């Protein structure tokens, strides 16, 4: 391998412009592929076979309106006073403008909806009063009737059907039960200064285009109402389609500055960054060109972007650093490039191989979006490796001795010396250092035992974002659970009449209302064939809280009694339930992924180094690092320790697929630096001997 890479590096250096043109052609083809196929990304996190996904498919076929995407617009008075009639009219105009947006099916006027709720409650109250008055009159009439004459006979003589009265009484009781289950459900706050409007889209939630969401916000903002503020929920305001954000750009800039300071020359500082950016561009374009052929999430290319930047800079820097050392010893430029690729390049090759194994192994989880994310990230690492072995030598050849600081370019060759008497403290006492580091990592890992997984809601958004403000206002004025309603799907027996089906729905609704952490149970909807019903449940707690997760489990546990007593089956659907299912499945798959990756990569390192100690040290180091990292993440983002330093204002569950991705990335980096460190553990004199052996220094 070292001889092959030596020849590859030297050949690339000799034909520098040809190599550069080839890579520019590859980039052009990749960009052309994206231009031809287009970019088709989705925010959907779907796992085939889960209950929520099966129910979503069922609703899409049987009750399309129940599967429509929705978003909420929160209106509020800026001074906290009640809405005036002029403000209500202005809000109505803004909502009507929203209905003209392509992709919007309808909007719900909160004031009309609240009036309907209030009227319904008032009608029930009036009906109850009339019923009580009628019962009193009936009792008085019964006392005054002669013997042998019943009240029913008198009612019939007056043209009143007694059976109809009983039916009206039953309907009244059903209405009262329905409103009792609804509790204090409102869409306009009790103090009349906050209101929630629902925007119904024509597409399902995860298929709503970002342009449609933006157009909704623009339409509302184009009709400002004096004294009224407006915020948009996460379903409308969130957009995660940007592949490069401020953090990535800042990271590249900081990396460039660090390289400039350490290398003390502009050319060597720019070279690793340039190759990394080219690698990310090629890999990302190739990935996006396939987005029309496979279901691809918006975040799928992001892992490749982050890893591509990291390893692209690292790999190129390893070769560059070896090349600079050899130039200082007087080795000719192209010969030095070949030797650098043959030595450091060999370490980079096997390091990249282990990283790719760790990433591609994400497919063993059986979770499509995670496997695809790992595969595309593996592609980014592969491109970074190929660039390091070909383009980096070409650029080094063109740079010549300018990769050295000016003072060193014409200096006499010299050997690097090692002061054997000035050994660092941690090397003089290796066992103490090892045990101390292990103890610190173990302590950091302790919080990982209480890790709870989930998918983020709007509470993690920036405090000045519209989706965070909407989330908080809804929670304060309408209850935390209003941010994450749960859809309960009821499978009914065949052949039921509408009344019989509604009775089954009422029984299920009563069971749901009796569960802990339930705030409101809204009236159920039936399909035309009365085979399926949908009931919306609003929890007391927020969508990412543990109590909501327990509620979903409690609802599913109702099936035992409901199936035996009512011959119905209930399932839980909706975004909140889907997030819970995805998180649970990812948590179950994490140990499997960890075990498979460690086993495969351990075998790879055993074959590469033909040693047991080096792979074992690398594996144990990774394991401790991974557990400590997970523990630190839990302490900060779930417990809130030091949250102010990291911008954590609302601690909550850990992003469900973060531990799996973190394990993959940390393992890749651990196995990345271990081969490089081991390859570089040689004295300068040994390196010179290696020059004539055509092999890496060991």
In which residue ranges do the predicted regions lie?
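Alpha-helical transmembrane segments
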Residues: 39-40, 47, 54-59
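A detector of helix-start/N-cap boundary segments at the beginnings of structured domains
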Residues: 42-46, 184-185
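Structured non-transmembrane domains adjacent to transmembrane bundles in polytopic membrane proteins
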Residues: 52-56, 60-67, 84-229, 450-639
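Acidic/histidine-rich, surface-exposed loop or edge segments in extracytoplasmic proteins
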Residues: 71-78
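Short active-site-adjacent helix-start/loop capping segments
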Residues: 79-83, 116-117, 239-241
């Amino acid at each position: 391998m070292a001889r092959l890479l030596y020849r590859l590096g030297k050949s690339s250096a000799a034909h520098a412009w040809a190599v550069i043109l080839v890579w520019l052609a590859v980039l052009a083809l990749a960009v052309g592929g994206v231009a031809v196929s287009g970019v088709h990304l989705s925010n959907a996190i779907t796992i085939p076979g889960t209950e929520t996904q099966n129910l979503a498919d069922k609703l899409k076929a049987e009750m399309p309106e129940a599967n429509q995407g929705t978003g909420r617009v929160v209106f509020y008075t800026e001074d906290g006073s009640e809405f005036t009639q002029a403000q209500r009219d202005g809000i109505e105009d803004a909502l009507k403008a929203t209905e003209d947006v392509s992709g919007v099916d309808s909007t719900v006027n909160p004031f009309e909806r609240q009036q309907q709720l209030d009227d319904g409650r008032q009608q029930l109250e009036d009906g109850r009063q009339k019923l009580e008055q009628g019962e009193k009159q009936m009792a008085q009439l019964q006392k005054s009737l002669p013997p042998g004459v019943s009240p029913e006979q008198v009612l019939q003589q007056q043209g009143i059907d007694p059976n109809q009265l009983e039916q009206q009484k039953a309907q009244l009781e059903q209405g009262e039960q329905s409103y009792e289950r609804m509790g204090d459900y409102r869409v306009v706050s009790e103090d009349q200064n906050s209101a929630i409007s629902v925007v119904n889209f024509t597409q399902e939630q995860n298929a709503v285009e970002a342009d449609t969401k933006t157009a909704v916000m623009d339409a509302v903002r184009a009709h400002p109402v004096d004294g009224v503020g407006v915020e948009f929920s996460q379903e409308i305001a969130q957009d995660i389609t940007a592949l490069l954000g401020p953090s990535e750009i800042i990271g590249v800039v900081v990396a460039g500055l660090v390289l400039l300071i350490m290398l003390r020359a502009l050319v060597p500082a720019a070279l690793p960054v340039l190759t990394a950016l080219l690698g990310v561009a090629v890999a990302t374009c190739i990935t996006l060109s396939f987005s029309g052929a496979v279901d691809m999430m918006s975040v799928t290319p992001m892992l490749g972007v982050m890893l591509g930047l990291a390893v692209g800079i690292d790999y190129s820097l390893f070769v560059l650093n070896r090349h600079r050392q050899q130039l200082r010893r007087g080795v000719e430029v192209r010969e030095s490039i070949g030797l650098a690729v043959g030595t450091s390049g060999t370490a980079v090759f096997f390091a990249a191989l282990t990283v790719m194994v760790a990433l591609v192994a994400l497919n063993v989880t059986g979770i499509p979006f995670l496997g695809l994310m790992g595969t595309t990230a593996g592609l980014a690492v592969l491109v970074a490796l190929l660039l390091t072995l070909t383009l980096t030598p070409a650029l080094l050849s063109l740079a010549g001795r300018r990769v050295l600081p000016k003072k060193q370019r014409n200096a006499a060759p010299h050997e690097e010396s090692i002061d054997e008497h000035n050994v660092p403290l941690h090397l003089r006492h290796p066992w103490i250092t090892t045990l101390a580091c292990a103890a610190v990592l173990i302590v950091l890992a302790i919080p990982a035992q209480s890790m709870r997984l989930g998918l983020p809601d709007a509470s993690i958004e920036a405090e000045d974002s519209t989706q965070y403000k909407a989330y908080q206002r809804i929670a304060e004025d309408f209850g935390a659970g209003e941010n994450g309603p749960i859809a309960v799907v009821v499978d009914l027996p065949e052949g039921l009449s509408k009344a019989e089906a509604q009775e089954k729905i009422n029984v299920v609704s009563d069971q749901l209302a009796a569960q802990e952490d339930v705030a409101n149970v809204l009236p159920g909807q039936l399909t035309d064939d009365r085979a399926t019903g949908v009931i919306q449940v609003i929890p007391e707690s927020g969508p990412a809280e543990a109590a909501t997760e327990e509620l979903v489990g409690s609802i599913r546990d109702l099936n035992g009694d409901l199936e035996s007593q009512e011959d119905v089956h209930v399932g839980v659907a909706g975004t909140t339930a889907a997030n819970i299912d995805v998180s649970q499945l990812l948590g179950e798959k994490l140990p499997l992924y960890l075990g498979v990756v460690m086993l495969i990569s351990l075998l790879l390192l055993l074959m590469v180094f033909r040693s047991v100690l080096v792979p074992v040290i690398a594996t144990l180091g990774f394991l401790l690092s991974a557990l400590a990292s997970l523990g630190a993440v839990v302490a900060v983002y779930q417990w809130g320790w030091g949250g102010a330093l990291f911008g954590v204002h609302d601690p909550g569950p850990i992003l469900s697929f973060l531990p799996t991705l973190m394990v993959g990335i940390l393992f890749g980096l651990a196995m990345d630096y271990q081969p490089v460190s081991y390859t570089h553990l040689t004295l300068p004199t040994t390196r010179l001997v290696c020059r004539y052996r055509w092999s890496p220094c060991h």
